[in-house]
Every structure is written in structure tokens, then in C-alpha cells.
Amino acid sequence: MLKTKRKSKKSKHKHSEKTTALSKKEVAAQKRKTSKKRNELVQAIVICCLVSAAVSIPLLFVARPKIAIAGGVAVAILQFSYKYPRQALWSFLIYLPFSGTITYAIGGGNAAFQVAKDAFYIPALIGLIQSCKKKQLPLFIPKEMLSTFSILLMMAMLTLIFVNGEMQLNPMKGDKPILQAILGLKVLIGYIPLIACTYYLIRTKKDLVFFGRMHVVLAIACCLLGLIQYLLLQSGKCAGTRGMTGEELYKATLQARCFVGGSLVFSPEVKFIRLPGTFVAPWQWAWFLISNAFLTFASAFCDPSFWWRVIGLFGMALVFANAVISGQRAALVMVPVTTAILLVLTGQFVNFKRFIPIGAGLAILLFFGAATNPGVVEQRWESFVDRWNAAPPQQFLFNQFEQSHNFIIDKPLGRGLGRATNSTRIFGFTQLIETFQPKLMYELGYPGMIAFQIMLLHLAFLTFRAYRAVKDKNLRSYGASFWVFVGFITINPQYYPLDVDPVSVYYWVLAGAILKLPKIDKQVQDEKHLELEGHELEVHDQLKEKKIIASAPI
């Protein structure tokens, strides 16, 4: 009996010695790996600096200093984004809400700055594709959507070849129909790969939580800048469109630009305000606020940390405040409606006590706002009611469909890719169509419009199925919050949010995040079933996380 006890003690001692030796080897290997990565980073920085200088110095002789420096920085970003796609995709999401401000503050409105975010996205996408090929991982996610996407792509290519191609044979003066079609196609489907990018970007629950927190911080930063912009205009430090006459009082202009963002309207004498926040145009700011009603809600009710939930609630309050002062009717209506819908559909109504602090905060904020700016909320509501009465949304949408139908009576494949896309006007004439489905009908005809809408509905179904398969309560709430946004944009008939920032990015990004939830849920469920305690559990979690990170393409 005594001998067996001694043997068991010796075996335990040997096992602990092996474990210690193994852990020492692992630590040494980790140190070598870290050192190698550090050296690679230093080398990459040196090369990027040299290439950037080689580009900037010659440009100084032919362009303004700002443009020359920006050109060099752009080349460095392209190199870095290709080498470090993961960091590039995070940078892409961070840069997005500030792109309008950077475009005018640094670029002076240069068109190149409006697509500068793609300097992060495109090289990162190329890097991801190469990494997926090496690790034999799927490139197109979700695989089930490949059929509907292929049909859409086929319809788009038919329009490009037979409609834009025909126009290219006999173009109008100044028109470049093929270039317009290529840019139009990029706007239409160029960000669909963000589904796969986000799917591989979010590897674990930690990444998902970081994703939510990052967007809350971005929302708070942008909303604070938006509040400052409003206060500067209200105090008269920025003139806005005060003192102008006739139509100029109602027209967004860059001459009225204030502090951040781009063109705006601020004509208090006629009770007409349209603020751009940190974006190029007021409509983009409205849809940023609507998008962040979903993103801040997700963190406010799903984040595992109490303090981050409080920060999320603060973000929701700021989004609501900006929806009131921005002058955007869509944001004024959709932000509170969205919050109410999310409370019901995500099942968070049972946690309504969490909503009490934000309710009290909003009440104080609105009371203070009403005291210092009497009539602001009333003006916004009156503006919304007047607009509704002047042009009811259902009638406006019907008129848009009728107009597009009349344009394509003799053109079954539409009028051409990019011909109703605002960002392609540098390559030729564009028709102003203010709603998305009629715009698709004008460009691609009935077949193309139906193909695109079917693809969106298919994606909405696949994401719904993915989030409903999740068992973990918190992850399911994240999925529900994200899916309501995807579902809303899928069936939204007003404006064309999928054509412009930020919705053209957020829609595909959140779809990718939802599709990853079942895998993250499996990781969480596996951890729950482990019968480990204390240090053993911590070591196991670290090893598992390392394996997940090592197997990921980025």
C-alpha cells in the first residue's frame, strides 16, 4: 500500500516535471515567434517608409503638398494592408465613419479621397484570398448563396455587354459607358466579399465583443463631433446657410461646411436644417445614426461587462440626440422605432430595467435641449409631418417605379450599369432615382432587379437560420440585433442605402458576423462541457484560442 502511494507520488512528480519542461519549451517557441513577427513588422515599416518617400517626393513638384503626402501614405497603406489583412480590415471599419471629414479636411474634396477606404479593403481582400487558398478554406461565404449571386452576376454582365457595350460603340460627348459600368458593378456587388472578410475576422467570442465595443466607441466619437458641429452652427460661430436667399436656403453646400463632414444646410430662419455629421452628405449621416441604433443596442444589452453595457446605453442616448438635431426625418423616426422593435424581437424587453438609465438620461437630455433650444423637437416633427403630407412615402415609391418602368419599356436589360448611380457621374450622365428598387430596375431591367432582391432575401434567410441555431443567450441576442438590421435593409424601399456609405459596408459586415455565430457558439458550448477547474481551465482556453487563431486565414 505504501509502495503504491510512493509510486503515484513519483508519477505525479514526473508528470509535473514534464509539464513544466513542455511549458518552458512552449514559452521559448512563443518568444521566438514573437521576435520573428517583430522583425518582420520593423522590416515592413522601413520598406513602406522608403516607398512612401519615393512616391511623395516626386509628387511635391507636380501637386500640392497635402496631395503629395497623401499619395505616399496611400502607397504605404496598400502595402501594409496586403501584408497585414486582419489589421487592415479593422482599420477599414474605423476609417469608414471619418472618411467624409478626411475627404474635405485633408483632400479638399478630391474624388480619390472618397474611395480611400478601399486602400484598406482591396489589398486585405487579396491577402485573405491567398491565405484561404493556402489553408484550403472556402472563399465564398455562405456557399448556399452562390446560386443566387451567380444569377445576379450573369444578369449584370448581360447588361454590361449588350447595353453599356452598345453605348460604348457610339458614346455621347464626355460619356465613358464601359468605365461607368465597371464602377457601377463595383458599387453594386463590390462589398459582398465583406461577408467572408468578417467571417474570418471574427474568430472567437472575444473578437465579437471587441467588434461591438469598437463600434460603440466610434458611434460615441462621431456623435460627439456631430453635437459640436450643431452647437457651433447654433451659436453662430459657423454661419451655415444663414442669410442666403431663394433655393440656396434649402440646398446643401460645401461653402457652409462646419468643423467636420461635408456639405450642409443650416437655415434656422426658414426652419430648415440638414447636418452631415462626420460624413460627406446629410443622408449618409442619417443612415449612420440608423445603423448605430442597432450596433449600440447590441452592446448595451449583450456585452458581458457591466461598464461596457453602460457605455453602450450612453452611445444609444447620443445617437438619439443626434437624430433629433440632425434635421433628418428618416433618423428622427427610425432610431426610436428601431429601438422599440429591437426590444421586442431580441427578447430584451424582459431586461427593461436596463433601459431605465437611458430613459432617464434621454429625459434629462431632452429637457435641457428643450430649455436651451425651445421648439427644436417640435420643428423636426412638423417638418416630418409636412413632408409626409406633401409626398406620402407609398405614393412617392409608386411614382418612382412608374418612372423607371417608362424608361425601360423598350429595354428589357435596363438602361445600363451605373446609369443611375450617383458616384459614377464622373464617367457620364446619371438619372436621379431616389429609391433603390426602381434604381435597379432602371439600370438592370426587371430581371436584374428581381435577381438582386432574391439574393438579398436569400441572404436574410441564411442569416436568420444561422442566428436561430445559436444556443448561448448572449450570442443569440447579438445575432438578433444584427439580423433585424439585415432584415430591415433587405426590404427597405426608401432611398438607396446599399449604394452609399456606411450601409453599403455595414450590411455585408453584419451578415458575415451573424454567419460566424454558430461556430463561436460551438466554442462556447465546448468550454461549458469541460470538467476543468482553475489554472487547468485557463491553460486549456489559451491553447484552444491559439489553435483557432493559427487555423484562421487572417
Residue ranges and their predicted role:
Residues L2, S150-M157, P193-C197, F210-G236, ...:
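Alpha-helical transmembrane segments of multi-pass inner-membrane proteins
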Residues L2-K5, L224-C238, F266, A323-S326, ...:
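A membrane-periplasm/extracellular boundary helix in multi-pass inner-membrane enzymes
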Residues E26-K31, I102-I106, K173, V260-T278, ...:
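Juxtamembrane membrane-water interface segments that cap and precede transmembrane helices
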Residues I69-K83, Y121-K133, L289-D303, M449-V470, ...:
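Hydrophobic, aromatic-rich transmembrane alpha-helices
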Residues F80-G109, V115-G190, I489, I549, ...:
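N-terminal hydrophobic segments of proteins, predominantly signal-anchor/transmembrane helices
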Residues I311-V319, T463-Y495:
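Loop-to-helix entry and N-terminal half of a specific, functionally important transmembrane alpha helix
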Residues T339, P357-I358, A480-P493, P497-K547, ...:
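Transmembrane alpha-helices of multi-pass inner-membrane enzymes
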Residues P374-P447, T463-V470:
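Long extracytoplasmic/lumenal interhelical loops at the membrane interface
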